[in-house]
């Protein structure tokens, strides 16, 4: 069986077309709030149930409960505060406001609460640091004085150049059932696949019916693979190296918080809402720099026996010259001098230099796809 949505019911915060047209015709009558791309994507994820059971941005009770207990105030597991900020009060509690991204009215929000918060507490409890060099902490420090809680209704979506690769939770659940998959393992990625990824995915697929590759599309940093490269590389990998109907790919737009262990739980909840029953938790999952231990995220799952999705902890793969193949530390008896770690950074440098990686690092078909792009990396 595909998993039950988090909280028991898949949230849908969409409005009928007639209602939408009426709201848009009256938009000048509403107070307005400008939002950034990340909040616009959060709105989409709330509206389509990716963040079920959230129906909007957190009120103060839920916000504080997430900080203190990693649960909503009704005790549902939830680890990342999904919030929207304002610099000053230009509307009141009880008002309805329109949220705009680049002059597009994305959603109507019913303001339940406007509240203050402690930025250092937010940073310390979510990211385990108050260091402004941490990108998540820097984001928190840039927020306005107030947070606004309340339910939302989606009016428009941010233009998506990869819409044909996007499936919502209501659609993936139908897809999994049509394929006859009772157990599904999800894999989150922001990279084109190398052989180490393939090893981990196939190790997980051994124990379930289907593999759900769910690339995260969104804000990129210099040197990252472009979104279209990731998608085409996976399509090629599926074509040549995966059993037919054993794997599928759909993208999700999401702004990484880099909250390490807490965000690993959040990622699992998102995939649970897509219908996955299992979730691959990687080494230093959702980490950045040296803020978190390499397997700290694994330990975090022990706090959530009621999460409703099974984590799969698969050790990092490497090539062993003695074994003659991809292995991990649990199954390879040979010393480190025989091991070749597959570094994503090293692979990118090789590709940038026009050097084809050896086949034990990257499938040649995948390399050819990457090479077919004039500029495969973000500049």
From Swiss-Prot:
GO MF term list: ATP binding; sulfate adenylyltransferase (ATP) activity
Enzyme Commission no: 2.7.7.4
Top-level taxon of the source organism: Archaea
Top-level EC class as recorded in UniProt: transferase
Catalytic activity: sulfate + ATP + H(+) = adenosine 5'-phosphosulfate + diphosphate
Keyword entries, A-Z: ATP-binding, Nucleotide-binding, Nucleotidyltransferase, Transferase
Pathway assignment: Sulfur metabolism; hydrogen sulfide biosynthesis; sulfite from sulfate: step 1/3
Record Gene3D superfamilies: HUPs, Sulfate adenylyltransferase
GO BP terms, alphabetized: hydrogen sulfide biosynthetic process; sulfate assimilation
Similarity comment: Belongs to the sulfate adenylyltransferase family.
PANTHER family named in the record: PTHR43509, SULFATE ADENYLYLTRANSFERASE (PTHR43509:SF1)
Protein name: Sulfate adenylyltransferase
Organism encoding this protein: Thermococcus onnurineus (strain NA1)
Lineage, opening ranks: Archaea, Methanobacteriati, Methanobacteriota, Thermococci, Thermococcales
């Amino acid at each position: 069986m595909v998993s039950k949505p988090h909280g028991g019911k898949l949230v849908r915060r969409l409005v009928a077309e007639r209602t939408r047209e009426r709201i848009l015709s009256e938009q000048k009558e509403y107070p307005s709030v400008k939002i950034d791309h990340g909040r616009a994507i959060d709105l989409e994820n709330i509206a389509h149930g990716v963040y079920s059971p959230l129906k909007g941005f957190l009120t103060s009770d839920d916000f504080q409960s997430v900080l203190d207990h990693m649960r909503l105030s009704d005790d549902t597991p939830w680890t990342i505060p999904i919030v929207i900020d304002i610099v000053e009060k230009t509307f009141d509690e009880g008002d309805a406001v329109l949220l705009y991204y680049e002059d597009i009215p994305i959603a109507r929000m019913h303001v339940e609460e406007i509240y203050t918060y402690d930025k250092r507490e937010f940073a310390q409890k979510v990211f385990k640091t108050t260091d402004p060099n941490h990108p998540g902490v820097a984001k928190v420090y840039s927020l306005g004085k107030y947070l606004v809680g309340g339910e939302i209704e989606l009016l428009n979506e941010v233009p998506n150049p990869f819409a044909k690769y996007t499936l919502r939770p209501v659609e993936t659940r139908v897809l999994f059932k049509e394929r006859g998959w009772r157990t599904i393992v999800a894999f989150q990625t922001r990279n084109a696949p190398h052989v180490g990824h393939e090893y981990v995915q196939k190790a997980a697929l051994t124990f379930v019916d289907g593999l759900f590759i769910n690339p995260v599309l969104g804000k990129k940093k210099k040197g990252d693979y472009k979104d279209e490269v990731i998608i085409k590389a996976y399509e090629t990998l599926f074509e040549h190296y995966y059993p037919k109907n054993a794997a599928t790919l759909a993208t999700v737009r999401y702004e990484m918080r880099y909250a390490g262990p807490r965000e690993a739980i959040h990622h699992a909840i998102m995939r649970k809402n897509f219908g996955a029953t299992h979730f691959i938790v990687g080494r230093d999952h959702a980490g950045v720099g040296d803020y978190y231990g390499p397997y700290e995220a694994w330990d975090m799952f022990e706090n959530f026996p009621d999460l409703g999705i099974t984590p799969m902890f698969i050790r990092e793969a490497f090539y062993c010259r003695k074994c003659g193949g991809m292995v991990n530390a649990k199954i390879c008896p040979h010393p480190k001098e025989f091991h070749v770690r597959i570094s994503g950074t090293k692979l990118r440098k090789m590709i940038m230099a026009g050097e084809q990686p050896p086949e034990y690092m990257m499938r040649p078909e995948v390399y050819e796809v990457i090479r077919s792009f004039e500029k495969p990396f973000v500049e």
